[in-house]
UniProtKB/Swiss-Prot annotation:
Keyword Magnesium in record: yes
Keyword Magnesium: yes
Protein's name in the database: Terminase, large subunit
Motif placement: Walker B motif: 199-204
Pfam name, any one: Terminase_6N
Length: 499
């Protein structure tokens, strides 16, 4: 029933009461936006990664929700109202419990942005609301009821210097005061020195010196930094550190316009077309401009295809790249010999999983299919344990007898990459659009300033290369589904000879 029809059936007093209730509900929603945050899968992946990685980089295109993600996470830390705790409402829209980094005490956070103006219009607006409209914070990600007090900055109109925020335990009990400071990069490195804080959020890419200073301020509490930005400056020092020389504490999550659920397919294509061609990769896909350094300078739409059932006459091979601290990867490659076209149909990638765990994850599609593997499969566990290859064979994988090589015995990375790239350009290498881990690596695979391939974040690509190199051992899907029955010849009857 429409609101007007409902109102017509109510007395004047009832109408006033109903409108007051609706107004009260809207006001509550506007001052508790944190509870409306329902992360997309990429946003959730970034937040969850905080459990294992002190330094995280959310590299995303424009207007995809990266700053809202950063603001929501900071608000959860400032208030302690993590999803799944008593401080978070049962009807909140987060969906599931909090799996990311968790602080168990009131925190001090620094929020960084490029200038006083951009801080006011972006991070501060998302965390606090528009001060120029409301004359007070409380209309952003930080619930209004949790803001104790705030102080304006003398450096720019409506810029907040800092906020005092109520912090809560997992039982929803207030246990102290968190502090949130806003800091622009434009004030220089000196303004980023001297304090001890729990965490720092850099929205838009900071100069490397300021990134280092901000991170250093968090050393006492184990280090904590998050970056959310569109990489319009290409392979800057910060981007280079995370992509080319990452430490074990660093994690990059890439989000493209195709991961944003608030746009229709038509809107996505319209937005991409509106960007200057040389900026499309950065603005739509969050991919830094790498110039001639990027290896696959091929539009990913030209190699993407819809998933389909594997025909009986296709040949199939699986392949894997071993890993523990960095992810291991398992892929499945289909080969249509008639058309000489390859399809990457399945991908699985995960860190710190044993051979048995990996088999449990891929058994449904890897059973009885030959598996190509790299030369490090000959290595033994520390302390003289089994070879890696043997561990995976024991778990259930149909490991090929020898490690991956070309038919001539070579295993050149350059040769493998070159052949795969040529197949892509000729339209003879396709990837199911469900294989997102492949595309995440495909977008960022590059060479360094000396022309050498940077061997980071390449687990799926390596596995794909191994499968392609060993395609001569692929099995026809018909034989995998319906193994040939061994026909036992009839016994030979003795021939009677005449006397």
């Amino acid at each position: 029933m429409e609101l007007d029809a409902i109102l017509d059936n109510l007395s004047d007093e009832e109408q006033i009461e109903l409108l007051e209730l609706l107004e009260e509900e809207e006001n509550y929603r506007n001052t508790h936006l944190l509870y409306e945050f329902a992360p997309y899968s990429k946003q959730r992946e970034f937040i969850d990664a905080g459990h294992d990685y002190p330094e995280r980089c959310f590299m995303a295109g424009n207007q995809l929700g990266k700053s809202f993600t950063g603001a929501a996470e900071v608000a959860f830390h400032l208030t302690g109202r993590y999803p799944g705790t008593k401080g978070y409402p049962a009807d909140g829209k987060y969906g599931g419990e909090w799996k990311g980094k968790r602080f168990y005490e009131p925190v001090v956070f620094w929020i960084g942005g490029e200038t006083n103006e951009t801080v006011t219009k972006t991070t501060q607006r998302i965390l606090c609301g528009r001060i120029e409209e409301n004359d007070e914070p409380g209309y952003g990600s930080i619930p209004k009821e949790d803001i104790i007090s705030w102080k304006k900055s003398p450096f720019f109109p409506n810029l907040v210097d800092h906020l005092l925020v109520k912090h809560h335990t997992a039982d929803g009990v207030e246990d102290g005061i968190s502090i949130c400071y806003f800091k622009p990069y434009s004030q220089g490195r000196a303004r980023w020195q001297g304090d001890t804080i729990h965490g720092v959020w850099f929205d838009e890419e900071p100069p490397y010196s300021i990134y280092g200073e901000g991170l250093t301020r968090t050393n006492k509490y184990g280090q904590f930094s998050i970056l959310t930005f569109t990489p319009l400056m290409g392979m800057s020092d910060v981007v280079t550190k995370f992509l080319k020389n990452p430490s074990k504490s660093q994690k990059v999550v890439n989000m493209t316009i195709y991961d944003a659920e608030h746009y229709t397919d038509e809107q996505k294509e319209q937005i991409i077309a509106s960007y200057p061609e040389h900026e499309r990769e950065a603005r739509a896909r969050g991919i830094p401009t790498m110039g001639s350094g990027r290896i696959f300078q091929i539009p990913e739409e030209t190699i993407k295809c819809q998933p389909f059932e594997c025909p009986d006459h296709f040949y199939v091979i699986d392949a894997q790249d071993f890993g523990w601290n960095h992810p291991q990867a398992h892929i499945q490659l289909w080969w249509d010999k008639d058309a000489d076209v390859f399809y990457l149909a399945r991908v699985w990638k995960k860190s710190e999983n044993t051979a048995v765990q990996a088999w449990g994850a891929v058994k449904s599609w890897a059973n009885k299919i030959p598996v190509a593997w790299p030369h490090d499969g000959h290595q033994h566990e520390k302390g003289g344990g089994e070879q890696l290859k043997t561990q995976y064979a024991d778990a259930g994988f149909s490991m090929l007898p020898d490690h991956a090589t070309f038919p001539d015995g070579g295993n050149s990375v350059e040769s493998g990459i070159s052949e795969l790239r040529d197949l892509m350009l000729e339209g003879r290498f396709k990837v199911f659009n469900t294989c997102e881990p492949f595309f995440e690596e495909f977008r960022l695979y590059h060479r360094d300033e000396n022309g050498k391939i940077v061997k980071t974040n390449d687990d799926v690509l390596d596995a794909t290369r191994y499968g392609y190199m060993m395609r001569r051992f692929a099995r026809m899907m018909r034989d995998i589904r319906k193994p040939k029955e061994k026909k036992i010849p009839a016994p030979i009857r003795p021939v009677r000879r005449g006397r």
